[in-house]
Regions:
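Bulky hydrophobic segments
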Residues: 1-136, 148-199
């Protein structure tokens, strides 16, 4: 039991550190000047395009049905917003789970805080792109929505699996407890002649 508690404590702070690192990285990316950010996206987009060419897939096929016609913009939205926040959603969700207590109220609070954190951080990263903090960029609520879509896909998935596992564990425990009570009652019945006479 003590080893399990120690492992949970270590995991808590590992995931907390990972969440902080990801958040710092996203904030730094948001603070990049427009020219630097565009150049970084272009380089990354070119690298992805090269990989697709090697396997015989065109960028047009990838963007088909997405509403995008600009490959660099598509890559920026997919990886810089949706994908990055999807990864953050997974790590942050586990962090909130690990810091929750063993009660329904605490677990629901963890989910609520994870949801508020995801939306708030998406808004913050867009705020950092305004002229108050950097140059050549601008905030977009559409990007906040894209960020939240990525974040909440993994957040909802992880919490759904977590809650389902807890419910199944409780159901299994009740069944085991019921089986033990039935077994104990049967043993008592066999040992008590008066109970058998009454039956």
């Amino acid at each position: 039991m003590k080893k399990k508690a120690n492992a949970r404590t270590v995991a808590k702070y590992i995931f907390l550190a990972a969440t902080i690192v990801i958040c710092v990285g996203l904030c730094v990316g948001s603070l990049l000047p427009g020219e630097t950010s565009a150049a970084t996206s272009d380089n990354f987009g070119g690298a992805v395009e090269g990989v697709l060419d090697d396997i015989g897939v065109s960028t047009g096929d990838v963007m088909d049905g997405t509403g995008f016609t600009d490959w660099q913009l598509f890559v920026r939205k997919l990886f810089g917003h949706f994908g990055a926040f999807m990864f953050l959603g997974a790590v942050a969700s586990v962090t909130f789970m690990l810091f929750s207590k063993d009660s329904t109220r605490s677990r629901l609070a963890a989910f609520g805080m994870a949801a508020v954190f995801g939306f708030s951080f998406a808004c913050l990263t867009e705020l950092l792109q305004t002229d108050l903090f950097t140059t050549g960029r601008g905030a977009s609520f559409d990007d906040v929505i894209t960020d939240c879509r990525g974040y909440f896909i993994t957040c909802l998935l992880f919490f759904a699996v977590w809650f389902a596992a807890i419910i199944l564990k409780h159901v299994a425990a009740k069944r085991r407890y019921g089986a033990l009570l039935s077994s104990a009652a049967a043993d008592e019945y066999e040992r008590d002649p008066s109970a058998q006479d009454k039956a």
